[in-house]
């Protein structure tokens, strides 16, 4: 069930920025990510967190906040940013444990993910 929620959140986000056929965009990305995860486990982790790219994670959160406020002022899509934060937190932890990022970089990421 969690995978369905995650995929539909990604589809809603893409629809919000004007991509009508979000499934067509996501299908190859999701297929490749799932295949790598099944074959490589946590070794398949890529992206800004595994690179320690704090600025990109911050930009993602700012963009999600802007999109959510512009599209749904009633907060209907607030779950998307909450999911991003939860998954970013978990990914940071896994990357630190697997020595993909240093403890110092992990702390910087945690400060961006959970600024309060």
What are these regions (language model features)?
Residues 1-76, 80:
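Helical "substrate-binding/catalytic lid" subdomain
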């Amino acid at each position: 069930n969690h995978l369905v929620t995650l995929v539909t959140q990604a589809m809603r986000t893409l629809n919000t920025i004007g991509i009508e056929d979000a499934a067509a965009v996501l299908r190859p990305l999701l297929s490749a990510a799932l295949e790598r995860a099944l074959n490589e486990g946590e070794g398949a982790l890529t992206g800004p967190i595994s690179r320690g790219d704090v600025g990109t994670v911050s930009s993602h959160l700012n963009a999600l906040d802007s999109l959510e406020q512009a599209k749904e002022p009633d907060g209907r899509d607030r779950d998307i940013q909450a999911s991003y934060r939860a998954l970013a937190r978990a990914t940071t932890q896994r990357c630190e444990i697997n020595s993909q990022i240093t403890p110092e970089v992990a702390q910087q990421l945690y400060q961006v993910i959970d600024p309060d």
